[in-house]
C-alpha cells in the first residue's frame, strides 16, 4: 500500500507514534509519505519506501493567522495525485482530520476516492478539541472519517462522553520496538550521572503544566532524603524554569540534572532505576512504556490510559493525581533494596511486551485493508 501519514513533527507522543508507525510500515514493504510542516524529529533517514513532503504556507499580510489547514489539504491533494496514494492516515484531530476531510472532498470531485483513517491521541480530544470553538469541527471530522482509532480505552470513553460521535472507534494502543530498549548498551554511561551507590530517577516529557513537573521535584525531594539518588529530567517546555527554581529553593539543585530534548532517550533509560510520571492527564503514557521496555519501573498517577499501561504492584504503582506523599512512599518501596528493585524491573520489561511493534502494527494494517476494501466496493 501507499500510505500518507499526517502528523505533528515534534517530540510529543502523537508525532513520535505516527513516525514510528510509518517506519514500521515501510519495514513491512509499504510506501510511506509523511506530510507535515517539517521533517519529524524521529525520522532520521529517507529511502525508497519513506518520503517526506513539506507543507509550506505562503505569508499573506491579509491573514492575521496563516491558514495551515488549507495549505495541508492542498498538499494532500497534490501528493495523492502525484504518488497514487491509497490511504490517508491523519494523527491528531486538530487540524489534521479536518484538513484530510477537505482533501477527500476535493479529490472526490476529481474522481479519486481515498479513505481516511483518523487516530485520536489525547489532548486533541480532552483539552483542545473540547473547547467550544473547536468542538463542532472535531465532531464533524471524526464522524466523517472512514475509520477512527484511539490510543487507549480511556481516550475512547472520553471521546464518546465529550462528543456526539456516530462513528465506530477502534482502540489500537501505542507501541514501541521493545528490542530497541533491551540492554544494548554495556556501560550505559551511568558513572557520568551518578555515584555507584546512588539510584537514578528519570522524568521525560514536554514539561507542560499537564505533566506536573513540580510534583516530580517534590517527589524526588522526599525520596532523596531516604535513598541517595539523582534526578534526570529530559525535555524542554514552559515548566522547566519553575522546576529549576523549585529545586534551588529546596536545596537539591545539585542533585537534579536537566538534559533538554533528546532523540536517544533509550540511552538514558538504560541506566535509570525509576521513572516518574505524575501527570494531570495521559491518554496513554508512551514515555512510561519506553521506560518499562528498558526495565524501569513506573511511579505514575492513575489518570487516563496510564492504568492500561502501568500495572499496579507489578510494573510500578499508581496514585491519585497530586498525591505526592503516596508517590514518594511507593518510590521508596521500589528503591529500598536491590532484590525489590530487580523484581519490579523484570516485571516492567515483561509487561511492555504487550505493546510491541510486532503485535500492534498488524492491527493498523488490518484496518487499512478493511477501509480500502469498503471504499472500493461498488
PLM regions: where:
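A short, well-ordered alpha-helix in the C-terminal region of glycosyltransferases
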Residues: 326, 333, 340-354, 363-366
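Conserved donor-binding/catalytic core segment of Leloir-type glycosyltransferases
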Residues: 194-211, 217-220
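N-terminal strand-loop element at the rim of the active site
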Residues: 5-11, 23-68
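Conserved acidic donor-binding segment of nucleotide-sugar-dependent glycosyltransferases
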Residues: 312-313, 317-324, 333-338
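Short hydrophobic beta-strand element within catalytic cores of glycosyltransferases
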Residues: 297-300, 310
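Carbohydrate-associated surface elements
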Residues: 154, 175
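Aromatic "clamp/platform" in nucleotide-sugar-dependent glycosyltransferases that forms part
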Residues: 261, 280
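A short helix/loop element that forms part of the nucleotide-sugar donor recognition site in Leloir-type
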Residues: 182-195
Amino acid at each position: 500500500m501507499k500510505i500518507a501519514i499526517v502528523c505533528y513533527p515534534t517530540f510529543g507522543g502523537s508525532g513520535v507514534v505516527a513516525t514510528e508507525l510509518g517506519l514500521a510500515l515501510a519495514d513491512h514493504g509499504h510506501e510511506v509519505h509523511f506530510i507535515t510542516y517539517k521533517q519529524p524529529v524521529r525520522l532520521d533517514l529517507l529511502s525508497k519506501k519513506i518520503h517526506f513532503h513539506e507543507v509550506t504556507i505562503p505569508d499573506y499580510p491579509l491573514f492575521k493567522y496563516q491558514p495551515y489547514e488549507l495549505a495541508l489539504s492542498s498538499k494532500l491533494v497534490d501528493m495523492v495525485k502525484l504518488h497514487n496514494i491509497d490511504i490517508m492516515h491523519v494523527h491528531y484531530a486538530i487540524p489534521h482530520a479536518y484538513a484530510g476531510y477537505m482533501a477527500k472532498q476535493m479529490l472526490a470531485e476529481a474522481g479519486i476516492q481515498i479513505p481516511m483513517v483518523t487516530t485520536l491521541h489525547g489532548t486533541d480530544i480532552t483539552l483542545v478539541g473540547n473547547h467550544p470553538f473547536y468542538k463542532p469541527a472535531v465532531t464533524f471530522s471524526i464522524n466523517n472519517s472512514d475509520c477512527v482509532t484511539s490510543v487507549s480505552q480511556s481516550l475512547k470513553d472520553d471521546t464518546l462522553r465529550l462528543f456526539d460521535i456516530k462513528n465506530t472507534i477502534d482502540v489500537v494502543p501505542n507501541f514501541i520496538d521493545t528490542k530497541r530498549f533491551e540492554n544494548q548498551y554495556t556501560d550505559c554511561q551511568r558513572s557520568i550521572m551518578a555515584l555507584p551507590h546512588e539510584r537514578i530517577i528519570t522524568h521525560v516529557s514536554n514539561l507542560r503544566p499537564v505533566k506536573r513537573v513540580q510534583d516530580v521535584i517534590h517527589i524526588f525531594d522526599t525520596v532523596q532524603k531516604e535513598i541517595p539518588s539523582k534526578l534526570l529530567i529530559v525535555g524542554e517546555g514552559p515548566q522547566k524554569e519553575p522546576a529549576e527554581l523549585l529545586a534551588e529553593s529546596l536545596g537539591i539543585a545539585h542533585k537534579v540534572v536537566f538534559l533538554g530534548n533528546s532523540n536517544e532517550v533509550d540511552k538514558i533509560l538504560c541506566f535509570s532505576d525509576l521513572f516518574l510520571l505524575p501527570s494531570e492527564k495521559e491518554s496513554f503514557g508512551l514515555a512510561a512504556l519506553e521506560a518499562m521496555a528498558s526495565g524501569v519501573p513506573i511511579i505514575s498517577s492513575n489518570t487516563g490510559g496510564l492504568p492500561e499501561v502501568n500495572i499496579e504492584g507489578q510494573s510500578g504503582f499508581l496514585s491519585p493525581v497530586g498525591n505526592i506523599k503516596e508517590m514518594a512512599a511507593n518510590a521508596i518501596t521500589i528503591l529500598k533494596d536491590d532484590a525489590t528493585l530487580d523484581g519490579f524491573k523484570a516485571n516492567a520489561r515483561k509487561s511492555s511486551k504487550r505493546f510491541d511493534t510486532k503485535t500492534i502494527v498488524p492491527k493498523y494494517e488490518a484496518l487499512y485493508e478493511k477501509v480500502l476494501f469498503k471504499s472500493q466496493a461498488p
